[in-house]
Amino acid sequence: MGIVRSRLHKRKITGGKTKIHRKRMKAELGRLPANTRLGARRVSPVRARGGNFKIRALRLDTGNFAWASEAIAHRVRLLDVVYNATSNELVRTKTLVKNCIVAVDAAPFKRWYAKHYGIDLDADKKSTKAAVAAEKKGRKSAHAAADKYDVNKASPKLQREWTRRRRNHRVEKAIADQLREGRVLARITSRPGQSGRADGILLEGAELQFYLKRLEKKKK
């Protein structure tokens, strides 16, 4: 059977040793951790107690991520694992676990933002180091250019709607900068080894500032 969660081999509080009077049971079976890595999707079903099935993700490259303050969610590409409070080894091996911090593709959120508010974040972007480096290396693909939404082709009715929406709207500067760069920090809230998915939320507010400081400190 291999790994077991049996109590038979444990010592008692008094120091005595339990006498093993029976064989190990299937219910006591333990399994190796999934260690879900970043890569082309590969999942496998695992039969659990009661005939139920867990979905064990071995490789994942996409997930559903929510932008909580805007009440939207998009399926986006996972780009990198950038921080894990538990272990730097999990960052080095790009292992996806619950509560790890990942960088996700900003394109779907940027496109939604342009369609919903009529604001093209690329039009007035400052030449940040990351953006300049990306342009120099020619990373901007034809696919990304095709996905871009043209805010200048909107109807008068839609422009009036945009004006109404922008009246009391304000986006956090740190998030806007990330959207311009094309990479947004997010936290995984699902359990890839149990549900077979890597879903999560974008970092905002104090949480985002905390992890930005951590990453800056890590670089030094």
Curated annotation (Swiss-Prot):
Q: Does the keyword Ribonucleoprotein apply?
A: yes
One GO term under biological process is: translation
Q: Which domain of life is it from?
A: Eukaryota
Cellular component annotations (GO), alphabetically ordered: cytoplasm; cytosolic small ribosomal subunit; nucleolus
What residues form the membrane-spanning segments? none
Which molecular function GO terms apply here?
structural constituent of ribosome
Keywords annotated in UniProt:
Ribonucleoprotein, Ribosomal protein
Give the matching InterPro entries: Ribosomal_eS8 (IPR001047), Ribosomal_eS8_CS (IPR018283), Ribosomal_protein_eS8_euk (IPR042563), Ribosomal_Se8/biogenesis_NSA2 (IPR022309)
- Xref: Pfam families: Ribosomal_S8e
The record's similarity note reads: Belongs to the eukaryotic ribosomal protein eS8 family.
Q: What is this protein called?
A: Small ribosomal subunit protein eS8
Q: What is the species listed in this Swiss-Prot or TrEMBL entry?
A: Leishmania major
The UniProt gene name for this protein comes to RPS8A
